[in-house]
């Protein structure tokens, strides 16, 4: 077994990996960007090293900086988590070239299956049929039009080198193609470092069912069970469950065997997920994720297996020690991804900010995997997953009711969250009766009753039990040698020396609270004085109907300006594109008129309510 592992990631997955490493007696090394210096995953690790930069390209995608941290820390292996460099074959090769163990599949397998086009070829050559599509990448919008005219509309444009719905666009006809291709290429490059895209026929009402596999270097491959991930918005999962409800046992067995067949065909080693679309009794190969999935906890809860531990053991060269007949599944588990998004009206707008309150759900059958604690900041530069709430029950209905209870207890202030939408999903007759699909949230579910900027419903529950002090803030008390009148607090102080972070705890006199508005900005959950201010926003979101002001609905970065001063525009016409939390948001004109002023440039960072353009 490895003795020290560097976790090349952040947030929830870095914390998750660190916990299993601790149970196995493996020392952990965290890496962090400038914004994450005081982040939860840094506090959870035994050591931490600075990568520098704020945006992913300068930090968590910076292979050179990560390998330097691995060298300095003496790590024996690197766990990539999910996202970032987890499906980057060049990174895996670099790790191996430095004499370290990459906790994941071999680089050549990542090359083969991480490329969604070649993965289709592997599956089809092994006799596993895929969704109707093309086995080559697309560079010209005309190719999309030809594909749609031949096989029918709508068409799914997808990133060739990544999953999770990132970079995926669905076009209903030729008029939408050019803008969608450009946007898909931009998002694919931002998320996965490569802009290649490919095409598939978009099925009308499918369910997304994926199969968890694990394989060792001795040639043993087994499937652990399936997950239904059909509750999605923007082709990204909101809720997952294990096992898939109303899936015939013969289909389950066939799907599991198909997943093993694909895994053997590519000589897979490590944990992985083979994804399928299921419709009308048939299933189609979609892609293989050569990494640990976000939703792996539901499989863990039903099988009793620790998938991270399996990853680490297989990476160390150990056999699985587990045969197919040894895998048992008990009960039902549901996971809700608690994202910092405002689901009002079904828009799911990114909502970066500081968690002024975070009360986790607890109790029988409930598990919360979080990447943040109270007082931490959810940055616009990274994924907006705050936590995952998992509920287990002896059957689906028990798990559903337990999840509703857990969501009601989860209290988060400071950012909007997806919790109100997830409560609506769990309470809907279509979900209860398994009449939903991957398109159900956006086409059927009515979220118009959710007020903008609403907080999670756990306020009463957390107030009753008392929310804990924010990590990194002071723990009130008295020092062992202090009298009652001399109130002191136990303060955690951080010091960075030569790129390595050290933490020291000491008793200091309690300081009075500043009575006015916060005169500091938060960086990685820590207050930092001297933050650069910006003008007070004119309002939140786009201006009201008829307004001449186009405003940013959230904090983000301007990545495209689509009009110029003097242009005539119509109400609803796209003015610019704002990227927040790696999602593109198009800002539109709220009236007919002429563009009088463009107040931003490409690359500018704007805050919620900032005016980006004026139309007269």
Where are these regions (language model features)?
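Structured functional modules or segments
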Residues: 538-616
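N-terminal beta-alpha lobe that positions the nucleotide/phosphoryl donor
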Residues: 1-273, 278-295
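Catalytic cores of soluble metabolic enzymes centered on carboxylation/carboxyl-transfer
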Residues: 259, 297-532
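Structured core elements
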Residues: 6-7, 50, 79, 156, ...
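Intrinsic low-complexity, intrinsically disordered segments
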Residues: 477-503, 537-559, 565
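Short, glycine-/Ser/Thr-/acidic-enriched flexible segments
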Residues: 12, 204, 214-218, 228-229, ...
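Residue-level signal for inorganic ion chemistry
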Residues: 46, 78, 212, 311, ...
């Amino acid at each position: 077994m490895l003795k020290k592992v560097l976790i090349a990631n952040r947030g929830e997955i870095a914390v998750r990996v660190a916990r299993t490493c601790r149970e196995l007696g493996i020392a952990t090394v965290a890496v962090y960007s400038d914004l994450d210096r005081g982040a939860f995953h840094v506090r959870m690790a035994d050591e931490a090293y600075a990568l520098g930069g704020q945006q992913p390209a300068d930090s968590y995608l910076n292979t050179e900086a990560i390998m330097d941290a691995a060298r300095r820390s003496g790590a024996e292996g690197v766990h990539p988590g999910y996202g970032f460099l987890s499906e980057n074959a060049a990174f895996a090769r670099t790790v191996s070239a430095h004499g370290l163990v990459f906790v994941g599949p071999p680089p050549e397998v990542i090359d083969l299956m991480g490329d969604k086009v070649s993965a289709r070829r592997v599956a089809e050559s092994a006799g596993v049929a895929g969704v109707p599509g093309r086995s080559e990448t697309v560079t010209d919008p005309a190719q999309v039009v030809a594909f749609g005219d031949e096989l029918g509309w709508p068409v799914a444009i997808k990133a060739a080198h990544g999953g999770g719905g990132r970079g995926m666009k669905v076009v209903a006809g030729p008029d939408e193609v050019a803008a969608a291709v450009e946007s898909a290429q931009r998002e694919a490059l931002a998320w996965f470092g490569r802009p290649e895209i490919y095409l598939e026929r978009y099925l009308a009402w499918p369910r997304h069912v994926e199969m968890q596999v694990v394989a060792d270097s001795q040639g043993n491959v087994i499937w652990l069970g399936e997950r239904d991930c059909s509750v999605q918005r923007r082709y990204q999962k909101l809720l997952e469950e294990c096992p898939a409800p109303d899936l015939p046992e013969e289909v389950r067995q066939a799907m599991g065997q198909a997943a093993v067949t694909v895994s053997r065909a590519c000589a897979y080693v490590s944990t992985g997920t083979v994804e399928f679309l299921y419709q009308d009794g048939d299933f189609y190969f979609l892609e293989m994720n050569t990494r640990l999935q976000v939703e792996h906890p539901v499989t863990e809860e039903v099988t009793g297996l620790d998938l991270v531990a399996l990853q680490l053991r297989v990476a160390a060269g150990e056999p699985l020690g587990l045969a197919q007949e040894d895998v048992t599944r008990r009960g039902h588990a549901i996971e809700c991804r608690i994202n910092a998004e405002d689901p009002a009206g079904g828009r799911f707008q990114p909502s970066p900010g500081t968690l002024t309150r975070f009360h986790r759900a607890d109790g029988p059958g409930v598990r919360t995997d979080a990447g943040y604690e109270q007082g931490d900041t959810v940055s616009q530069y990274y994924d907006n997953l705050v936590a995952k709430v998992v509920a287990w029950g002896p059957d689906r209905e028990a798990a559903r009711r337990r999840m509703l209870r857990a969501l009601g207890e989860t209290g988060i202030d400071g950012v909007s969250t997806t919790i109100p939408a997830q409560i609506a999903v769990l309470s809907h007759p279509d979900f209860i009766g398994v009449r939903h699909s991957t398109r159900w949230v956006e086409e059927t579910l009515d979220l118009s009753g959710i007020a903008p900027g609403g907080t999670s419903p756990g306020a009463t529950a957390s107030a009753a039990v008392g929310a804990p002090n924010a990590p990194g803030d002071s723990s009130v008390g008295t020092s062992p040698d202090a009298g009652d009148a001399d109130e002191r607090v136990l303060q955690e102080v951080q010091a960075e020396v030569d790129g390595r972070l050290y933490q020291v705890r000491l008793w200091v006199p309690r300081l009075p609270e500043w009575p006015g508005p916060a005169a500091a900005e938060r960086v990685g959950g820590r207050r930092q004085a001297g933050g650069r201010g910006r003008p007070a926003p004119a309002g939140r979101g786009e201006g009201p109907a008829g307004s001449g002001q186009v405003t940013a609905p959230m904090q983000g970065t301007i990545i495209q300006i689509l009009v110029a001063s003097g242009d005539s525009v119509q109400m609803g016409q796209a003015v610019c594109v704002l990227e927040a939390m790696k999602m593109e948001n198009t800002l539109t004109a709220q009236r007919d008129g002429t563009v009088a002023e463009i107040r931003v440039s490409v690359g500018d960072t704007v805050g919620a309510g900032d005016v980006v353009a004026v139309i007269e």
